[in-house]
Structure formats: structure tokens, C-alpha cells
Amino acid sequence: MKKYFSRALINDILYVFFDTPDSDINIFNEEAVTQLEAHLDFSLAFRAIVFCSKKKTFIAGADVKEIANAYDAPDERINEIVSKGHEIFNRIEDLEIPTLSIINGAAMGGGLELALACTGRVVADDDSIQMSLPETKLGILPAWGGTTRLPRLIGADNAIDLICSGRSVRPQEALSLGLVDAVVPVKDGENLKDLRYGELSNLVEAAIPALEEELEKRRSQKCSPLKLSMIESMMTFKLAKAMISKKAGKNYPAPLKALSVIESCRKMSRDEALEAEKVAFCELVKTPTSKSLIEIFFGERKLKATAQELASKVSMPQSVGVLGAGTMGAGIALCLANKANLPVILYDISEEQLHSAVSSAKSYLDGKLSKGYITSDEASRVLSLIKTTTDVNEATSKPDLIIEAVPEIMELKRDLVYNCDSSKFVATNTSTFKVDDIAGYSTFGGMHFFNPVSKMPLVEIVAGEHTSDETIGVLCKVALAMGKTPVVCKDCSGFIVNRLLMPYLIEFDKMLAEGYDFVHIDEVMKNYGWPMGPAELCDLVGLDIIYHGSESMSKAYDYVELAEESTCTYLYKKNALGQKSGAGFYNWSGTKKGSKFADCGPRKEVPQEIQERLMAPMREEAARILDEGIVNHPYEINMSMVFGAGFPPFKGGLLASEEFSNS
């Protein structure tokens, strides 16, 4: 039997080290839970128990494969697994000696729930450490005491925020919330897992006296009903329900269910609350939404695993040149500096454009600063990494990776790319042209970001006919460092996302020519699950981009037929380009959508017919992409559309089986 734990006894304190076999991270699976229980026997022989990690993470959470299996498992089996976790964590909480979690890395889901059951928690002062209860992102809720203990520890409003959003907190925020008792200084590059026993013992010995003194008080706090006045309770839960309903909507039941559990359990004892938590988990884990969101989780993990494998064989560039300081170039430069910590030389022929790019970066960082997400020193560091220039040679001669992000003009892109040293790695951010039509050498490939760069997680990494594996590896490595999810594909017009979106928008244009009401269509597709309908999407992307994209699609693929009387073309030629011009299908005041601007047909059909008509061309194009080997797996298409186009995650993806049963 493989061991998940080791232990050591130092000065009558038992140290239990989590060390998941054959894994880079620690995870809680059924075997780990069973083995953990054995380490709690004879606990009264010790002064305290300390939970530590032998890996760079503390505990990354429950094994999602086991959660996925619960969808088809009998209710009794799910009850058994959840109850086992409750039983063991209750044993930890009820010990007559203090318990301490030393959080040296990510503590997520069941890992954080273990820490919550302990008397105390300390975390390394490392801003890369994330602590979270992300279960609602998988369509479930924290089932090993998270909805019970966290509100009692940090307050209902803070717990609702963390549980219902699934967001992570860093060490300093965790300290301010009361989630941890102390933040332990560490040197750059160090991890608490590497402490010698003597150093570890000193850290623990300093913490234990206070935990011994407050043992009963702390346990009572987590086992007793929440202390909220009637007014506090009404305000907290009423406001939270309104906010969560608006954000999550009807298609994502987990956040509201988690809120309901927290609210209903506020007057219960610990054991009563845990029972309610278990019942809610068993309901959610059987929903199609949970199954779909778990499929998304695995799909993303597969994409990142592929990219990480390619990236592991190459070195990280030391600096990057970005050509073009427009919306995309400015966003790419900021993300490189902010997320990847890479020096950037941002080039543009316009001083005004460069100034605008830097101002935009500063505004973005000021927003993060005002919310407490970063410090002023961190904001200054990011800005110091971005250097601007109007000298193209400076931007192309010094960096060892160059990303071209100028407007979609073939001659301009070709000129800039061909002026780059072919011994350097060069990527184009084109959205409409084939990579091979711009250039064809081994160090050149595609790196297609989506707007806005700061928010959109997908990057299409495009291999042209001559692009080397090393180049693809470098582009993947940089994308991962930027916090993106790369999908590697072969070269074709539109790549994956735009090639799939254009048939959808072309079909929409044809429906307008037949007299359909675009406002009605927008509502129907939003009800389907899209964040916006096709008319609003055209306005946000820009009718000029839609026009050129449609033309490009029809030239590249002879089976594509455009609308004979195109509303999109009509608006484009009237310079009604959407949000950027103030009017398109709708009137716009900045980023606020107003009344309809374009003429609207009277025709309305049954929503299901409209949805199927618009989605069918997209699915047909997806089949062609697979047949052509642009990508090889349906999950690559599913993830591309979810992360690059906003396809509704609760449906599992464009080609997911649940897409039809959930609609």
C-alpha cells in the first residue's frame, strides 16, 4: 500500500507530513482520508499535532476524479464518503490537544477544510500561495465543513464571498480576514517544506502556547451557532442573495445553494450544520451542471498539461518586444509585465498611442491597488518593466521573443515580421490571416490573444507549416507564465474560435435578411446561456471586424455562403461599427448599451428553433476542424469556445453530450 503520510515526533509534538505518492501536489482521495484517520490514534500521548506538507503545495483539495464518479454513484455511497470526511475532521477539531496547519503552498477545497478543523493556521508570506474553497466553480459546495466552519471563523459576509465566488485569497488578506493566525516570513524562493526539523520546531513551539490557552474558546466558536442579530442576518443574506442571483443566474445553482446552507445553518450546532451541508452536496453533485463544470475542469487541465509538456523542453525568454501599442498590444504588454514578470519593450510609431498604452496600464493597476489586490510597490514594479519606443529596431534587436500586434493589414504585418531577426522567436497576434501567409520560418508562429487580454484566459498557439516544436514550446511557456490557458492548433484561416464563431454570426446575418427581430434573437441566445446575443457581440467586436472576418471566411472556405442582403455589411458601410463608433445594432454611450439603432424585423420564432439554427453551423464547423486535424480532440474545441468565446460552461462545451440535455 502506498503511503500518503509520514510523521515525526519532536519534543512530544507529532508532525504529520502529507505526501501524495506519484504526484507533484497533495490531494485528498478516499485512501488518503482513511490513512489520515490512523495518525489520529493515541493523540493524547502528544502535546500537539501539526499538519505539514512534503510538497510545494499544502493540499490542493479533493480528488476531482472521485467527485466526478459521484454523479453515477448511489446516494448511500456519496453519503458514506462525505460522512467519513466529517467524522475525521470532527475528531481533529475535538482533540484535547491543539492542532496546527502549516500552510506552505496552495490550500484549496478539502485541504483548506482540514486547516479550518485545526485549532490554528499559519501560512508562509509568499504571495503565490492561494487559499480557497473553489467547489462552487465545479457546481458543488464545500462538503467537509467549509460552509459550517468558515462563517463561524471569519464572519458570514466574508465566508459568503469566498464560498459563493470560489475566489482565492493570498496570505496577507487571509490574515486580515482571520483565516490564519500568522504569516511567516520566508526568503525569496524558499518554501516552508524545506525547513530543517529544528527550524520547524522553533516555529511550532512559538505558536503552541497561545493555541493551548485558547483551545476551548476556538473550538466553541466553530461548533456554536453564528452570532448574528436579526437585522444583521436579514441584511447579510438578503443582499448576498440579490448579488449572487444576478451574477450566477438560473444555470449555476451551486452559489445560491451554498448561501442557502450558510443561512439555514446559522442557528444550528456544528453537527446539525454538517448534516445540512452533506444533503446539499449530494443534491448538487448529481446535477448536469456539476457534471459539465467538472468536464470543463478536466478539459482545462488537459490543455495545460499539453502546454506544460511542450514548455518543459525550452527556456523562458528573458525579455519580450511587442510591436503595436493599440488595444491588443497594450494588453499583451501589461500582462507580460504583470503576470509573467517579464521586461517588455513596447513599440509603436505613435508617441500618443504609447502614452495611451501606459496610461491604460496605470489605470488598470490603480484599480487593483484601490481594491487591495496589489501594493503600490508591486504596481510600480510592473510599470517599470514596460519600456516604450518609436524605434522598431530597439524593440526587435534586444528581446529574444517578439510579438507582433499591429492592425490586421497583411503588408504591415509582413514588413514587421520580415524585419525581425529569424534567429529570434517571433509570434503574430493575427486573428484573421493564416500564419503561413505572413511568414514561413521555423522560429515564427501564431499567438492569438483575445480581447480584453487581462480577462480572457485563452491563447491560441498556432503552428505554421515550418514552425518548430521549440517555437511552440516557447510560446506555450510564455502563455502559461501570463496565467493563460494555451490551446495548440495547426494553421488555418480563423484558427479555432473565430472559425467557429463566424458561421454562427453569418447565419445570424442570414436570419436578419429573412426579417428576424435581432433583439428577440439576442434574448433567446442569452437564455441559451451565452453572455450576450449575436447582435450585441457584433457591436462589441466591431462591425468592421465582422465584415472583414466574414469576407475572409468566405474566401478561405468555398462552402461558406454570406447573406445576400447583409445587415452587418450595411451597418459597416454606414460606419455604424458598434460600441467603438457609438452605434451599431444598438446605440452606445461608452460601454453602456442603449436602445436599438438598426432597423429590426418583425419575425420571431420558437426559441428552440432559433437556438438550433444558430448553433448547427458552429457544430458542423467543429466537425470539419476535427476532420482536418486542426486539433485532434473534442475537448480542445470545447475549452476554446468556453475560454475564448464565452460559450456557456454549464453546457460542458460545444461538443459535450450535456450540451443538448441542458438546453
Feature locations, PLM:
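Conserved CoA-thioester-binding segment of acyl-CoA-metabolizing enzymes
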Residues: 1-52, 76, 83, 90
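Short, active-site-adjacent cap segments at secondary-structure transitions
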Residues: 56-60, 108-109, 433-434
